Amino acid sequence: MPASLIDGREISALRRNELKQRVQHHVGLGQRPPGLAVVLIGNDPASVIYVSNKRKACEEVGITSHSYDLPAETTQEKLIQLINELNQSDKIDGILIQLPLPKHINERTIIEHIKPEKDVDGFHPYNLGRLAQRNPFLRPCTPLGIMNLLHHYELNVKRKHAVVIGASNIVGRPMSLELLLAGATVTICHKFTQQLQKFVEIADFLIVATGKMDVIATDWLREHQVVIDVGMHRLPDGSIRGDIDFKKAVEKVAWITPVPGGVGPMTIVTLLENTMMSAARLRE
């Protein structure tokens, strides 16, 4: 029997509608619309598409998107100067720096210059530290979006074994913290993990964020599993797929996210929700 689909498009649409009403209520109280600064350095095609989608999503819910498109040769000093200005601006509630950055700019340095209360990506060490200490505020968008998906479908991770494949600062590590916060027993696998198959086979929840296709063989999967595929790869024919072979996996597991249409839409709506949360807090 094919797996049940975890539909990120449907759930993100519901959450966007709820958020739109919250923004309208916020403005109805005499506040300006929440403001999100979206900073793009260079013209990487994938980044341009991602930024365009985020700006469009802002418009749909009533958040004001402030665009800062900088040339690829922008210096680190110039970027920090812009961030400092955005930190001080009373029109900006959230700051998003589109990653990856050009090689001459230090990603960690840039993230640490963003005010934690405007760090709507949730990457600042302060915000990650709060998550680790079980007192989160602004949380990384993809992991939180995944947790919201699981919650909607009543897929409870408490007392279950969750295996995270990938240990990036953006997904893998904060994902493990979210799962731990929710009461799961968590195993993190990475490029140095031995006997990866063994960990995959014993997972109740499998979150795959390797950035590579087919690291996880389909015959490792089990019929009771919930599989969350964070990967996104564009194939030569223009189609998009995830880290896992969806067509095979959907016939083996209990629940699975499609790619596209699974995790991606939830990441964007969570970014908008973080921006609204930041705006509300900055008004307190």
Swiss-Prot record:
HAMAP family: THF_DHG_CYH. Signal peptide: none annotated. Keywords: Amino-acid biosynthesis, Histidine biosynthesis, Hydrolase, Methionine biosynthesis, Multifunctional enzyme, NADP, One-carbon metabolism, Oxidoreductase, Purine biosynthesis. Homodimer. Belongs to the tetrahydrofolate dehydrogenase/cyclohydrolase family. This is Bifunctional protein FolD. GO terms for molecular function: methenyltetrahydrofolate cyclohydrolase activity; methylenetetrahydrofolate dehydrogenase (NADP+) activity. Pfam families: THF_DHG_CYH, THF_DHG_CYH_C. Catalyzes the oxidation of 5,10-methylenetetrahydrofolate to 5,10-methenyltetrahydrofolate and then the hydrolysis of 5,10-methenyltetrahydrofolate to 10-formyltetrahydrofolate. Its EC number is 1.5.1.5, 3.5.4.9. NADP(+) binds at G166, A167, S168. One of its GO terms (biological process) is L-histidine biosynthetic process. It catalyses: (6R)-5,10-methylene-5,6,7,8-tetrahydrofolate + NADP(+) = (6R)-5,10-methenyltetrahydrofolate + NADPH; (6R)-5,10-methenyltetrahydrofolate + H2O = (6R)-10-formyltetrahydrofolate + H(+). InterPro entries: Aminoacid_DH-like_N_sf (IPR046346), NAD(P)-bd_dom_sf (IPR036291), THF_DH/CycHdrlase (IPR000672), THF_DH/CycHdrlase_cat_dom (IPR020630), THF_DH/CycHdrlase_CS (IPR020867), THF_DH/CycHdrlase_NAD-bd_dom (IPR020631). Pathway: One-carbon metabolism; tetrahydrofolate interconversion. It comes from Legionella pneumophila (strain Paris). GO terms for cellular component: cytosol.
